Each structure stands twice: as structure tokens, then as C-alpha cells.
């Protein structure tokens, strides 16, 4: 059996830690899995290229203050990959309809890593939908002098080593590497990420389109990020008209997992300032 056949025949596994059952909203024939908890201002998170299917402590902290919504994009978590899905353009249009069906007019949008790229693309297309924008260790802009690491060239151990500063935190959130179903699922998610980011690993037009985004914007960098150079968060903050840069100490590329309290405080400060 090939990997592709295995992916198609393997049910989505449920992680032993932090798993919660999702809700589903069918959008243009694609059932979008999402988790939602809390009340108040609507805050939507676009996830990165991993750690799906979980309601992690950071999500719980956010839900204590806002209406926190965490969808899983096509090919990730429990959202299937439609045959027609190919680009960030497809994702942006899908999410716009998703928000429409949930009755969300204006939102606070948060994007992490690959999801930061997606959030930036969404903001550039639909700036009037946003009350605020927060980008956490985002990717998607071109850095000529320091392009960073190509994640598709790394082995899984090399990738996880670069994602985290704190290896105890890494071990807490990693799925069982010996679980066959988990291995197949992670392969399928990496393939979904490749559809969006294989080549090029940036959008030359994005930094120009971001000039349309006038809402309060927070860019969160990580002082010890060994996956994405700090120049990336610097550049996002520079090109966004109302961009503000905060860089968290003591964390690698995954501040959601390594510094959830500090990250929550920074995000809520930006959200409350725009509400």
C-alpha cells in the first residue's frame, strides 16, 4: 500500500492529549472542522502546519476572555482536502464564506506561522472584515538576505528540534511517533502544507497588498526562533500600516505552546485596544 492509499483509507486519529470533538460547518461542499468556546468578541485563529485536533491550554486561556474559534483548514485535523483546493486564494475565499455562514461580520483574526501567512492574505483581501489582526511568528514575505530554513528539506527530528526551545514542552505535545495512524496523518498534513508553501515560500505581492490593512495589528516574534529568522516578523511589522512588533523571550517558533500566558496577554491587549 502506498502512502497516498494509506492516507485515503486511514481514519483521522484522536490524540491522547488535549483532544476535543469538533463542530462542523459545510462550506462549498467541504465540511470545515472547528472548535469554539467562550463569549464576547469573536476571535478566530488560523493554525500552523501541525498540532491540530487539540484544544491546547493557550486556546482555553483565550476562551476565558473572548469567543475563541479555531477552524482546521482543508487537509488538516478533521477537515478533508477537496480535490480543487490548491492555494491561499482558495483558502481565503473558503474562510470568507465560513465566516458568513457562522454569522461573523467583523472579527479579530489571529494567525500562527503558516496560519500567519493565511491571515495576512485574508486581511489583504478582506480588510474591512477585521477589527484587529495578530500574526504570531508568521511566514510568507520574501527575505533576500536571510530566507530561513526550508521545512521540506528537514527530517522530522530536525524540524521538531528547531520548533522548540524547551524540549520538555515539545515532548508534552508531540504525538506518539510509533503510532502508524498518527504517522500517516502527519504525512497528509505535511502534504497539505506543501500545496500552499512548497514553492515559492513567499508571496511577492503580499507586502504591497498589506498596505490596505488599516486595523490595529500585532506581530509577535520569538527571540529564540531557529526556524524563521526574526527579520520576518520585523518586515511584517514594517509593511503593515499600523503594525506593532512584540518579541517574546524564552521561546522558539511555538510560543502558543511554550509561552501561552505571555502570548495570551499580548493578544488580548491588541484585541481590547481595537474593540
Regions found by a protein language model. Name each.
Residues 144-150, 156-214:
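Conserved alpha/beta-hydrolase catalytic His-Asp/Glu region
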Residues 213, 219-221, 225:
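Short beta-strand/loop motif that positions the catalytic acidic residue
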Residues 117-125, 130-162:
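Flexible "cap/lid" loop of the alpha/beta hydrolase fold
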Residues 27, 69-110, 265:
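Active-site loop/oxyanion-hole signature of alpha/beta-hydrolase fold enzymes
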Residues 28-78:
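Conserved HGGG/HGGXW glycine-rich cap/lid loop of the alpha/beta-hydrolase fold
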Residues 107, 111-116, 222:
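Conserved alpha/beta-hydrolase "nucleophile elbow" surrounding the catalytic nucleophile
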Residues 243-275:
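Catalytic active-site module of serine/aspartate enzymes centered on a nucleophile-bearing elbow/loop
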Residues 58, 215, 229-238:
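Short alpha-helix in the alpha/beta-hydrolase fold that links the catalytic acid
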Amino acid at each position: 500500500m502506498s502512502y497516498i492509499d494509506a492516507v485515503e483509507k486511514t481514519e483521522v486519529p484522536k490524540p491522547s492529549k488535549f483532544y476535543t470533538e469538533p463542530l462542523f460547518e459545510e462550506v462549498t461542499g467541504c465540511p470545515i472542522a472547528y472548535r469554539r468556546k467562550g463569549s464576547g468578541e469573536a476571535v478566530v485563529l488560523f493554525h500552523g502546519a501541525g498540532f491540530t485536533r487539540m484544544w491546547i491550554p493557550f486556546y482555553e486561556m483565550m476562551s476565558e476572555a473572548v469567543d475563541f474559534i479555531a477552524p482546521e483548514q482543508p487537509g488538516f485535523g478533521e477537515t478533508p482536502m477537496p480535490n480543487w483546493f490548491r492555494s491561499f486564494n482558495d483558502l481565503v475565499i473558503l474562510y470568507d464564506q465560513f465566516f458568513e455562514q457562522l454569522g461573523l461580520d467583523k472579527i479579530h483574526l489571529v494567525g500562527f506561522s503558516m496560519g500567519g501567512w493565511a491571515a495576512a492574505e485574508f486581511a489583504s483581501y478582506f480588510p474591512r472584515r477585521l477589527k484587529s489582526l495578530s500574526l504570531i511568528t508568521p511566514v510568507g514575505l520574501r527575505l533576500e538576505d536571510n530566507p530561513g530554513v526550508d521545512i521540506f528539506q528537514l527530517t522530522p527530528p530536525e524540524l521538531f528540534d528547531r520548533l522548540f526551545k524547551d524540549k520538555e514542552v515539545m515532548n508534552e505535545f508531540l504525538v506518539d511517533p510509533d503510532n502508524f495512524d498518527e504517522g500517516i496523518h502527519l504525512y497528509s498534513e505535511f502534504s497539505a502544507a506543501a500545496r500552499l508553501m512548497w514553492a515559492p515560500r513567499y508571496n511577492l505581492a503580499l507586502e504591497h497588498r498589506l498596505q490596505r490593512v488599516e486595523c490595529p495589528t500585532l506581530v509577535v516574534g520569538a527571540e529564540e526562533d531557529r526556524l524563521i529568522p526574526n527579520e520576518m516578523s520585523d518586515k511584517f511589522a514594517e509593511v503593515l500600516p499600523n503594525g506593532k512588533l512584540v518579541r517574546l523571550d524564552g521561546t522558539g517558533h511555538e510560543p502558543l505552546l511554550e509561552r501561552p500566558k505571555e502570548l495570551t496577554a499580548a493578544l488580548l491587549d491588541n484585541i481590547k485596544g481595537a474593540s
